[in-house]
Amino acid sequence: PSLSGQESDNIVLLLMSLPHPSADVVKSIEGAIKWFQKSEIKGIQKEYFTNSDGKKDYRMVPCEDCPTLWARFYDLETNRPFFCDRDGIKKYDISEIGHERRNGYSWYNKDGSKVLKRYEKWKKEQNK
């Protein structure tokens, strides 16, 4: 089990699309926005390279002024991003998982940005 920086975005966008949301829906949206804000990952980006086996690979490297990212999975207790191979064992550094899973899965995304942007508009609409 985990929190998700990818699947959660569409759920929150759906909730914000509801006309006349109930107090519970508003509370859920506000809670989700706080989570997206506290879960932002800044200062890293993908760098592609050819690994020692001659395969295309990537690693996360520091960067300035790069887009904010969210991890695919966050630990339920610590909110720390984690990654895993097909065995499901949590790893806290993407370089610790195998090439196949690292390159065959979307571990980082920018989807939270559209949620936060839409939230600003939604909040204004709610205050009318």
Please state what every model-predicted region is.
Residues 1-2:
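Intrinsic, low-complexity N-terminal interaction/targeting segments
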Residues 6-128:
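Terminal, non-catalytic domain-edge segments
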